Amino acid sequence: MSWIEPIISHFCQDLGVPTSSPLSPLIQLEMAQSGTLQLEQHGATLTLWLARSLAWHRCEDAMVKALTLTAAQKSGALPLRAGWLGESQLVLFVSLDERSLTLPLLHQAFEQLLRLQQEVLAP
């Protein structure tokens, strides 16, 4: 069991999702309002991915906004990034060093991803 498993497990429980031990290196949570949240452990990094499918007519504006906001470092203290999956899936993500991972940092990263998503999708 990795030392960060209790942190990830507590985070999932805070979101109302029970976990079992041992945790998978890839956890996928379906969020009712914001799409799919994935937590992926790889090496000494934990990456949070927030993916959401968009209607085709919103894709271009969302892509430009997401890339502009993340490139301009307007996304807050954490290095948020944006990408695109397939034809219509906006992906916002942040990678965290496991050595500095805490429960408050995990919540902060998720909240910043949610705020960025809301800003990108705002009219």
From Swiss-Prot:
Role noted for this protein: Functions as a specific chaperone for YopN. It could facilitate the secretion and the subsequent translocation of YopN.
One Gene Ontology term from the biological process aspect of the record: protein secretion
Organism: Yersinia pestis
Matches recorded under NCBIfam families: type_III_SycN (TIGR02503)
InterPro entries reported in the protein's UniProt record: T3SS_SynN (IPR012673)
Compartments reported by the entry: Cytoplasm; Cell inner membrane
Keyword Protein transport attached: no
Signal peptide, first to last residue: none
Gene Ontology, cellular component aspect: cytoplasm; plasma membrane
Self-association and partners: Interacts with YscB to form a complex which specifically binds to YopN.
Record Gene3D superfamilies: 3.30.1460.10
Keywords in alphabetical order: Cell inner membrane, Cell membrane, Chaperone, Cytoplasm, Membrane, Plasmid
Name of the protein in its database record: Chaperone protein SycN
Lipid bilayer topology: Peripheral membrane protein
Superkingdom to which the source organism belongs: Bacteria
Pfam family, one: Type_III_SycN
Cell inner membrane keyword on record: yes
